[in-house]
Amino acid sequence: MSGISNAENGKAIVSSGVLNSVSAFVRRHRTFVYTIGAVAVFATVGGVYHVQQKKASHKRSKKLKAHQDKAESKVNEGKNEAAKVVKEEDLKSSETGKDVETAAAAAAAAKKKKKNKKKVKAKKVGDSSVDKIATEESVKSMTKEERAKLAAELKTLGNKAYGQKEYANAIDYYTQAITCSHDPIFFSNRAACYAAIGDFEQVIKDTSEALSLDSSYVKALNRRSAAYEQLGKLDEALMDSTVSCIFDGFANESMTATVERLLKKVAEKKSSALLKERPPKLPAASFIQTYLDSFHAQPKPLFDNKFDGDAALAEAYEYLEKGEYQLSYDKAKESCLGSFSSPSVNARTHNLVGTFKFVSGDSKGSMENFNAAIKLDRKFIQPYIRLSAAYLDENDNEKMWKVLNDAESVDKTDSDLYYHRAQVRFVSGEFAEAISDYQKSIALDDSFIYSHIQLGVAQYKTHAIAESMKTFEDCKKRFPNSSEVYNYFGEILLDQQKFDDAVKNFDHAIELEKREHLTIMSAMPLINKALAVFQWKKDISQAENLCRQALSADPECDIAIASMAQFLLQQGKAREALEYFEKSAQLARTESEMVNAFSYAEATRTQIALTEKYPQLVGRLSNPM
């Protein structure tokens, strides 16, 4: 697999590739497809803020002054206590939104909140020691100016009580301030108190009230988002944090981290549910075919139909040749339960079952079968290679290399071994070592096309452009009917922004696919051409049409599905794009792939909901591609 990318110009190319690790194959392609245009939704979960208007210059009432003096005397009892009090300058600063509490800080504060909650537990919210200064009756007789003046002073007392962690008193002060004036700041500050004692339902009520008065109040959005998350209402939390970020002008990096965390939590929840309800299934036929094509065809073993294991395996091989992979898998599993004419035939059964498990995303399950195959026939190299790929899938590089070394000690003449070892080195960025192994593979069998193609790609990655071009020109002469040669060569030309030549090669690859592959056609030349015309001519309509052709050729091609979603998103067709992202999640092999797909689906869903709920923000959304 090439997966050529150019870090300097930010462009990348998707290739169909043939890689020993199927998961790595999918992950690398998905990474590109999604990065051509991630949905621009960013947000943050806000922390606790204290807001402060300018201190009123008027004279305080005697009764209020007595309570304020009492609060101030507590502040002055000691330097340590004074340090806890929230200063007016800090309150004013927090109003600007610069004191955004990060997700990490929120997590760290969670433990403190539990302690604080214990302290307040004995004293209910209504058990404050605050006298009722502002009541519904008393404020009726006040002028507008008097109510505003009293509200501001009550808020000041609330801020001080909050700073001293006297949350019941702070709630009472803010409640009385609200009695004087329905100011969104008072509701948001009271919500901060409820958050401190863990009453998240009340946080949502107060912040919702604040937002009904001021829909662009960022701190209220942040507080409500945090409360929603605490209650497990992740979709609502994601919406609030997204809107908050847009109002805040995407200025804070923690907002991006927060929305990513929320997206991941939502995606993990949905992935977990889908994995529980979805029965194990094989990936698309083209996916399986691509993997199988990365190995030389093995000669069939000599079957003895007197043994039921042999007979079932013979049928499994017949289905395999026809591309009827589910039937082949079923027969292979049936074969495992039977008797065999020889350990060698039995080894082939385990190898085939392990292969189907591996391409289905069950790397750990496949290891049992591959190990069984090796134990039954230690000279059979293919299960060694596939076992190493399973370890690579599980990020166990130490065991992967041990298996590859064991295979080499058994047989130094197996071309597949060096090809797949080269692939491991290639994806690790060890291009010089990969080139050496590709050359070993070619020296052992120069008829295997993928060793030649990948050699050319590896040479290109080391900036040996002339050598790479020569390798591909030689490939075109030696394998004139191979669509893969023209597809990969087109990718390299596209990476050099030689658009016209790249498209010509993709077109030739498409024609060869139509002519040579009547049953399972590769969609990759069509997808690559779509990317080319988009980069070259910005022709989004043609790019979409090419993706639709790719899906017609291979309806379950995950790369085509993800590409289609992105091109639709680019055109503002978010609802249709969402359908493709969700389909991508349904087709995902592994949980990590599923989480990735659901993350983009949820980002798109949030964008749709946001444009409906906050139409005034549509113009402030970043271009999705």
From Swiss-Prot:
Output the GO biological process annotations, alphabetical, semicolon-separated: protein import into mitochondrial matrix; protein insertion into mitochondrial inner membrane
The TPR repeat boundaries are 151-183, 184-217, 219-251, 347-380, 415-448, 450-482, 483-516, 524-557, 558-591
Lipid bilayer topology:
Single-pass membrane protein
Q: Which organism is it from?
A: Schizosaccharomyces pombe (strain 972 / ATCC 24843)
Q: What is its main location?
A: mitochondrion
Q: Supply the name of the protein.
A: Probable mitochondrial import receptor subunit tom70
Indicate, by first and last residue, each region the UniProt record lists as having compositional bias (Basic residues): 56-65
Q: Which residues lie on this side of the membrane: Mitochondrial intermembrane?
A: 1-31
The annotated phenotype of a deletion mutant is: Abnormal mitophagy during nitrogen starvation.
